[in-house]
Amino acid sequence: MAAPPLSSWPWASLGSYKYVLYGAVVWKVAEEWRQQGAAPVGSWWLHLLLLFAARGLTYQFWFSYGNMLFFTRRRRVVPDSVDFRQVDAEWDWDNFLLLQTLIGATLVGSPAVARQQLLLPSLKQAWDPRGWAIALLLHVLVAEPLFYWAHRALHRAPLFSRYHAAHHHASVTTPLTAGFGTPLESLLLTVVIGVPLAGAFLMGVGSVGLVYGHVLLFDFLRSMGYSNVEVISPRVFQAVPLLRYLIYTPTYLSLHHREKDSNFCLFMPIFDLLGGTLNHKSWELQKEVYLGKNDQAPDFVFLAHVVDIMASMHVPFVLRSCSSTPFANHFVLLPFWPVAFGFMLLMWCCSKNFLVSSYRLRGNLHQMWTVPRYGFQYFIPAAKKGINEQIELAILRADRMGVKVLSLAALNKNEALNGGGTLFVNKHPELRVRVVHGNTLTAAVILNEIPSNVKDVFLTGATSKLGRAIALYLCRKKIRVLMLTLSSERFLKIQREAPAEFQQYLVQVTKYQPAQNCKTWLVGKWLSPREQRWAPAGTHFHQFVVPPIIGFRRDCTYGKLAAMRLPKDVQGLGYCEYTMERGVVHACHAGGVVHFLEGWEHHEVGAIDVDRIDVVWKAALKHGLTPA
């Protein structure tokens, strides 16, 4: 069956190459620049580009604000997060901006317009208050009712299923949802936004300022409504009751998206009142949301840290197109590096741990908090005390909130820093929150990656917490472990922990040469290209080193960091954890999830209990977590 007209975008097959369509406008600006010998500041072609950029930034501003959960968590209308399904559905949310820019370009380039200056004011006329008055009048008397009745029509069969249903695909709105729609809906919005401008221009009172002001104010209010965060105090409506019929709120719009049979207005609820479609719960719910009654304490917390400056921008409140895919050094982020560097200095001086993202698993709220410290800072001796204080504050805060389990990420559980979390458990024996380093499951993931026919392995980082557990586990399986360490004392201490009949399988080596015939390398310490050359062709590098080693050898294979895929029934997950694929989390994160799901009452800190490796692994599989 053929798709209904104006239900799909003509440039859908172009993907990101759709932005080439802006080329004609860019070329016109460049041509005028060449002819004038200077920037064409009085060019409508230039204004089209500037307006497009300003509009995109408006939506991005509200999107970023709405996803700064450390600011907005308590005032979110729908507390759930956006999932990958919604991210993909709204990927081309800016199609309407492209459409309206092309319509504007057609208008500017029209011979009739160029000849008669129809609709286009003099560029010297930057401001005319009469134009603003006319535009406001036309917005209230024409644009608002036009949108209201068209919107109601789109909610009737068959228009809803053919055109508008996709816009209602999710109950969690974001400013990007505002732009997501079919060409028909976008053309309708173009008419709605254009009527006040056209009226003012035809009456000879248009201005450049009116174009920018009207369009950007329209986008600002639309983004605000879709932000899913209450920003207007209920006291304002109590002081001026009439105002509730003149401006909508995010709660007002959210009710429309969830219930679909009320609150159809553009910005002014008075049209719902006149049309009999006003949801009278709107302002009571708005008050509850603004006062934080919609807030919920998490059940599980994963306490992460920032890796580096580029990775600091891989968060849900920067660019969703980046944070919803595995981390990479996207070129679009490079211009913002100085800004990110400034924020690093600011966080070093005066920040505390903050909420980054959340998801739900089987009705329980899981959150990721971040310690405001970067990877390099963990190796500065003078910073050790401050980092531990940040981690301790996070643990105590979680304890007060009633969190059941808090899992420590990567460097937050460094042995030299806090003994794998033992520092906090010993200092606060009365903790109700269970502190978990997650390394038991990390060890299990690494061990279960090793083929069953392997007879010997080469282990770097051999005397670390993970290295010790891996060595002791493998020797019980009668697998010879070449443990790279210069410390005979630390090696012998680990060897004595093994049962007497298996101690012979633990072998100390101090150089890489003994491993040149071993094709299974377990990497717990960084390997340089020179050190990797000792591995024979066909070697597989299993990794538990942060950051992971760089794969220089083309004749070898490189494993990723230990990770597990969350169960299929996870909800509201729309953020990739660092370099992990969608739906995949680091094994230490997954270890905390398993600890919570099992309801275990013990802290998992300090040395890894080798006897629990298989127990934790089986529990993870039982709950639906799978190897990534």
From Swiss-Prot:
Subcellular localization(s) per the UniProt record: Endoplasmic reticulum membrane
EC code: 4.1.99.5
Major localisation: endoplasmic reticulum
GO annotation, biological process: aldehyde biosynthetic process; alkane biosynthetic process; response to abscisic acid; response to water deprivation; wax biosynthetic process
Domain Fatty acid hydroxylase, chain residue ranges per copy: 137-277
GO cellular-component term (any): endoplasmic reticulum membrane
Keywords, alphabetical: Endoplasmic reticulum, Lyase, Membrane, NADP, Transmembrane, Transmembrane helix
Enzyme class: lyase
Membrane topology reported for the UniProt record: Multi-pass membrane protein
Disulfide bridge positions per record: none
Catalysed transformations (reactions): a long-chain fatty aldehyde + 2 NADPH + O2 + H(+) = a long-chain alkane + formate + 2 NADP(+) + H2O
Record-annotated membrane-spanning stretches: 37-57, 131-151, 191-211, 299-319, 331-351
Gene Ontology MF terms: aldehyde oxygenase (deformylating) activity; iron ion binding; oxidoreductase activity
Stored Pfam families: CER1-like_C, FA_hydroxylase
PANTHER family listed in its UniProt record: STEROL DESATURASE
Subunit (UniProt): Homodimer.
Name of the protein described by the UniProt record: Very-long-chain aldehyde decarbonylase GL1-2
Gene: GL1-2
